[in-house]
Amino acid sequence: MKYILLIYNEEKAWANLTEAQGRQLMGEYMQFTKEIQENGNYNAGSQLQPTASATAVRVRDGKRLVTDGPFAETREQLGGYYLIDAKDLDEAISIASRIPSAKTGTIEVRPLVQTGAPATA
């Protein structure tokens, strides 16, 4: 089954890392990504640009509304994702718990709707 692992963390915490801390964290991410690639779990993944680069699009009463930045102000911002294959939720949670940012932020684990299968609540 496919799951998306949404990585939330405080952007300020990332911005305040020293160069050495940033290199170490990127090394941890590279190692984690290599492991899930070798295990056959990896489908895709990427770090996102900061929320200041985001554009929110909504359509209300037939009119397109475009605003800069994130829609909601929250303590943690969406900073990246992994799209993985896992046999079940337990395996997806196990993989999510190994993401380096799980130590300082939140990893949201969500199953994808399988093509041809109804969504479950």
Predicted regions and their residues:
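Conserved, structured core segments of small domains
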Residues: 1-121
